[in-house]
Amino acid sequence: IFFLFFGLSQITLSQEKKLNIIAIGAHPDDCDFKFGGTAALFAKMGHNVKFLSLTNGDAGHQSEGGGALGNRRRQEAINAGKALGIAEYQTLDNHDGELLPSLQVRHQVIRAIRKWNADIVLGHRPNDYHPDHRNAGKVVVDASYMVIVPNVCPDTPPLSKNPLFLYMEDNFTKPYPHEPDIVVSIDNIIELKIDGLHAHTSQMYEWLPWTNGGDEILAKIPTTINERRKWLSKRVKNRSNNIDSIKRISLVKWYGKDLAQKVKYIESFEVAEYGMQPSDKDIRSLFPMLKK
């Protein structure tokens, strides 16, 4: 009964204002890993969700590359977006492994946020193992104030108010660890998250396994679609089950003790110090699936 009620309460179309959410990652699949479940929840509730990859992913493979790989990854991203049910998955043509927080890329981000009329913007934290992740995080921070400045990118109308900017979760602790200000249960949507990641064939079943052990590990990856998805499902669920004591406190805050104790899979977000500084009431309005 709990899961039936919990699922219906999150998936029923919201009668409130439709929200515009844009998640900005460095590569096709970044947003899917860190926000895919919550994005699917927003989409199921009738809100407008866009994923934006700042690079085309044309370097992320052990045996393919260049334009052919970029085209492959763009199509994988489109397929992932369809699986998640989001409105749009856009991949820019900046080269993978070469992303810089340049003025040109900043302007791309400013225009994208404005054109989506974003209420919520998600990005990487600017401290990460991958230079593209770091620079993607920095360029979103650099754009955070400029989205309301009329004389910057005057070809796109400025936003009337600053959106809520959020950091997607990572495991790095220096200079400080991720702070789980908002923790969302994705129990009733985890299969859609897996479907979205499953669409990134070149990454889930080729490139990422290879980076963890080369051809020896790659040879152990299942070859049939069903076995691959089962293999991926186990890993995504393990990754989504990282509920430590701090995240549990946040879950209790947003869902109440009884519901929070039953949550198995989550995604976690940190409120950035830039842009809108929300009250708890604001967060519940912007994350309607959190309402008790």
Task: Give names to the regions the model predicted.
Residues 153-154, 159-161, 176, 182-292:
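C-terminal accessory domains and tails appended to enzymatic cores
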Residues 1-16:
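Bacterial Sec-dependent N-terminal signal peptides
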Residues 112-156:
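Active-site adenylate/phosphate-handling loop in enzymes that bind or generate adenylated species
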Residues 105, 132-140, 161, 189, ...:
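Internal, well-ordered alpha-helical segments in soluble enzyme and binding-protein domains
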Residues 87, 119, 163:
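Conserved acidic residues
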Residues 13-116, 138, 146, 156-157:
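Active-site rim/loop-helix segments in enzyme catalytic domains that contact anionic ligands
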Residues 61-64, 176-180:
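Short acidic, glycine/proline-rich loop/turn micro-motifs
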Residues 149, 159-163, 167-168:
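Active-site cores that bind ATP or allylic diphosphates and position pyrophosphate for catalysis
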